[in-house]
Design a protein with these regions (language model features):
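Surface-exposed, charged secondary-structure patches
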Residues: 50-101, 109-115
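Short solvent-exposed beta->alpha transition segments
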Residues: 3-6, 11-15, 20-77
Length: 115
């Protein structure tokens, strides 16, 4: 809940289409090696650290896509399917948490999903 003058109102739910567009732009930037574009969708992490992490990931990603988007109130859960050239990890699924910042969906956290 957020406070408005004299009122309490629920936090706005995320827009699924906007989240899907942002998530797709992010993962396609990673897959194409455009680290500068990919880092624009990350919130709360040091930009230099995020850029270095994404550069390492981009080296092994061969194809990636948004697999699922589910809205959970003020957050969205986005699952990615990522194909890689990494030995022993040809397919990785990631689950990420996105939230709205000034009207723009940004990635907050993520982890690999056990297969």
């Amino acid at each position: 809940m957020k406070r408005s003058p004299g009122l309490w109102e629920p936090l706005r739910s995320m827009d699924e289409r906007a989240v899907r567009r942002a998530a797709d732009a992010h993962i396609q930037a990673v897959a194409s090696g455009d680290v500068d574009e990919a880092v624009e969708y990350i919130f709360g992490e040091d930009v230099g650290k995020a850029r270095a992490n994404l550069a390492r990931v981009a080296e092994v990603v061969t194809r990636a896509e948004v697999e699922d988007v589910s809205i959970k109130g003020p957050e969205a859960i986005v699952q990615f399917r990522v194909e890689t050239s990494a030995p022993g990890h040809p397919l990785v699924r990631l689950e990420t948490v996105w939230a709205d910042h000034a009207g723009r969906p940004l990635l907050h956290a993520g982890h690999a999903i056990e297969q």
